[in-house]
Amino acid sequence: QCCWSQEYFPFSSSPEGCTDPAANNYDANALCDDGLCCYTTPLTLDIFTADWCGNASYMGWEVQDANGAIIASGGSQNSESYSDNTNYSYDICITDTCSIYNLILYDNSGNGWNYCSSGASATLTDPNGNVMVSTTANCCWSQKDYLFSPSIQGCTDPTANNYDATAVCDDG
C-alpha cells in the first residue's frame, strides 16, 4: 500500500483520491487510491453560507444511507471550516438510486444557519439539474433532516390499481 504513516518516521503522505480512470471522480493527481471511486453520476450539493457573523464554521452536513451510514459529509462534520458569504459545491456518489437517503444539516452552535441574516442555503440536485432538496435554513435549530431518493419511487406493476408510470423503483 502506498499511503501509510509510521509512528517513528513521520512524513508527508502521497495525495489520496480515486486512481481509476474509469470512475467519474478520477483524480489524475492522486497517487494513492482512497477507496471512494464513484461509478455512477454523482448528485451535487451546493451550500451558501451567507453572513454568519463570522461563525460559518459551525455549519456542517452529512448524507446518510438508509442504514444510517455516512456516505458524504462536509463543514463542521468533516473538520472543514466554512467562511461567511461563500459558495461550496460537493459531488456526492449515490450507489443505490432506489434507496432513501437523508441529508442532515447541522449547526453546532444551535442557532440555525441564518443566525445573523438570511440567505444561507443548501440545494441538492441530480445529474440533470432537477432539485431534490432545497432549503434556506431558518433560525434556532441544531439539526435539520431532509429525506430524498434519487429516483421516483412507486408501484411499477402495470396491472396494479396504484400503478405509477413515472416510477423507476418499486416501493413494494
Tell me what each language-model feature is.
Residues 1-172:
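Primarily marks secretory-pathway-exposed extracellular/lumenal segments that are disulfide-
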